[in-house]
């Protein structure tokens, strides 16, 4: 099968690209044809199996908020693939990830908020946002934005809805609390994923040596200085 990896690397986040692609080549869905689609404002050289899509250089948090808008812009290209998976560029793969992640719509449980009572999870509570989740409408699970995907058809159906919602929010001077993650969680309450991966697939690096954490790491969110990277 043909698998496309979606990644965004703006500003200083470009430093993580090479490591992530090396990890994917070594440990992600081996045995399938893997290609990449990198969204960046940088002028970069890549291997033949990586396509670069140029985006505007915008301040944080526009590059993450508008990720689904970027995907929709490349819909014709993305639609050539059987499955597509989005990785935050500052992720690492520490254990082999195989066909267990193949499903129509795949989301990953948040490495922290999954353990909170659902009424304490930080859904968007602003009624002016299309990501709004009223008290009492919380989902059974809360999902992280760092790794998700699925069949191209189902994933792009979600992307088109969320791109439209983000655009409408921006037209009303509204930004969802956790940007794309808030928008995605609202969508997944109404359209549950066909596969909910455990926090093993979006594992906080600072938990690597915590013997009491109930999951083992497969894909990790690297510990970093967010303020420095976004400056």
Residues of each region from the PLM?
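Catalytic core and acceptor-binding pocket of nucleotide-sugar-dependent glycosyltransferases
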Residues: 137-225
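A structural signal for short, well-ordered beta-strand segments and their strand-loop junctions
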Residues: 37-38, 84-88, 108, 149, ...
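Active-site regions of enzymes building and remodeling cell-envelope glycoconjugates
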Residues: 47-58, 101-109, 212-220
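PAPS-dependent sulfotransferase catalytic domain
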Residues: 100-157, 161-162, 181
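N-terminal anchoring/stem segment of glycosyltransferases
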Residues: 1-66, 73-80, 224
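GT-A fold catalytic core of metal-dependent nucleotide-sugar glycosyltransferases
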Residues: 68-118
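Short, polar loop motifs at secondary-structure junctions
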Residues: 36-45, 89-97, 201-202
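Conserved glycosyltransferase catalytic-site signature
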Residues: 64, 68, 89-91, 177-182
């Amino acid at each position: 099968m043909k698998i496309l990896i979606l990644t965004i690397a703006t500003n200083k986040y470009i430093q993580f690209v090479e490591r992530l692609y090396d990890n994917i080549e070594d440990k992600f869905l081996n045995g399938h044809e893997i290609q990449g689609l990198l969204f960046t404002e940088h002028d970069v050289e890549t291997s033949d199996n990586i396509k670069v899509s140029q985006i505007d250089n915008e301040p944080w948090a526009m590059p993450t908020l508008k990720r689904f808008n970027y995907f929709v812009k490349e819909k014709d290209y993305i639609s050539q693939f059987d499955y597509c998976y989005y990785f935050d560029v500052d992720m690492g793969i520490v254990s082999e990830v195989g066909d267990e992640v193949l499903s129509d719509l795949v989301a990953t449980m948040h490495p922290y908020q999954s353990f909170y009572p659902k009424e304490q999870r930080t859904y968007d509570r602003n009624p002016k946002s299309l990501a709004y989740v009223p008290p009492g409408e919380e989902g059974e699970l809360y999902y992280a934005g760092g790794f998700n995907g699925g069949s191209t058809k189902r994933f792009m159906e979600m992307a088109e809805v969320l791109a439209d919602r983000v655009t409408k929010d921006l037209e009303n001077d509204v930004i969802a609390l956790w940007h794309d993650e808030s928008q995605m969680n609202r969508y997944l309450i109404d359209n549950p994923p066909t596969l909910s991966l455990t926090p093993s697939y979006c594992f906080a690096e600072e938990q690597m040596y915590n013997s009491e954490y109930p999951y083992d790491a497969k894909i990790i969110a690297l510990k970093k200085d967010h303020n420095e990277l976004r400056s």
